[in-house]
């Protein structure tokens, strides 16, 4: 980028795709474009932080960037405050995001201005805050924003032609936030949490460096875990907090410590199947705390608390309050009571990890292993992404999770229980047409209904015949590699070339937008090791190439599947990656040398 730090300039397609899921789920409820310099740096920072606290993605253009820098505000994509550039023309980079969202998620044809503007107006929740004085260039930019459906709010009063709902004069900068949300009809869901620091999805990507760290809880070095336990209603005292061991202020600065938190839940509609669903949310809940970083899950978690957050008064009870408030808020349909126990005593953490947590994880893993597409009575739809891709429908099964990687069959089941009219609806599977393809009359009827007629047929296990649609939020793309008679897979994080002659972004432009593209499909990372992956075409033994990082991530599970299905040991050693080849000819040589099974299979086309 030609822009100087901290300005980012152009935002890559991969960044837009990463924003897709939080925009769909409402974790990012809107996009603010702030132009020019505020009357004072204090007003600039107050406005930016007010949007950040609401989870809104904030993009900055012009003088407001230096005002935020001068005030020492932490900026960057990780905390959802993105300085684009100091010149007003840098606003084109956020306009580009809106346009590409229409192309990526909405399947809008490039050049179709009418449908493009309809899409941005209806589906991209953006607005502009423009500080006085406004020159001709800023006015022109504002007119462009209005044409895309984005209202402009300004404190300029001279020579301004007010347009209701589109060009709004608000002289009081402290009211820009409320005026903007009302103009764009953005509803903010607020979870009131009594803690000494901010809590917002904008902090979810925040990195806490070692030098800024007050204390670290490290599951790779100490006994740590997080666990949800279902109890009877009489066994749980709602909102009870128990601390076993020292609090954060009794721990040495910069030290590695142990921690365990046990969340007891009870409710008439609570099911033990929901426990891992709740636990997976802890990662997001803890990361949303300003100055706290969480990675991992189960008994391999790592949590860092920053010095600033500690000095603001953040202690164990505040961590418990975050877990309690979010569980009660998000899962109120099934949780009537919730109590949190935090353990920091070393002996107790070790004892509870081995006697309580690990056996619970083992029981769940057994349950998940027994969950197959054949063993369950129903599947679920997921249409969360229709906010961006109106014709896309995911069919979620135990062995095929949502293509975003975030919605498993248990997640969809829990979502349906919590919100029976919501995005995850029951799909029966009683009328089988072709078991090998994964085609059912009931599934066809469901996708036709949920796509409002855009789709008529879908198969669950084929890449060639009516494959499932993709929206644009997919973790991976799989495509036919004709030279080797197999398929290559690439993931969003990999920006290099593939043996298909296309990058992830180029493949995604063919695959997304809610359309069916035989020979290509978007999918989640976990689906790669599923016994149902491309079952109709021969399964995982068709995989001939994927980026090395992705291969390393899925190796253990994929090797296990290949061993069970084909009695092949260390199957991933036969799969090419970018260190071996990025062109089909070199890849074929490698596969031949390794004796890859795809070379002996029936042609896919």
Predicted features along the sequence, with ranges:
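Short internal beta-strands
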Residues: 55-66, 82-83, 152-156
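Short N-terminal or domain-adjacent regulatory/targeting segments
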Residues: 1-25, 105-113
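Cysteine-centered metal-binding/redox modules
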Residues: 7, 133-144, 151, 155-605
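A short, charged/proline- and glycine-enriched loop
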Residues: 21-32, 122-125
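Histidine-anchored nucleotide/phosphate-binding helix
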Residues: 37-58, 140-147
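Conserved N-terminal structural segment that caps and organizes enzyme catalytic cores in eukaryotes
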Residues: 3-4, 38, 162
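Acidic/Gly/His-enriched mid-domain segments of enzyme catalytic cores or analogous surface patches
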Residues: 63-126, 139
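Structural motif
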Residues: 33-39, 60-64, 129-134
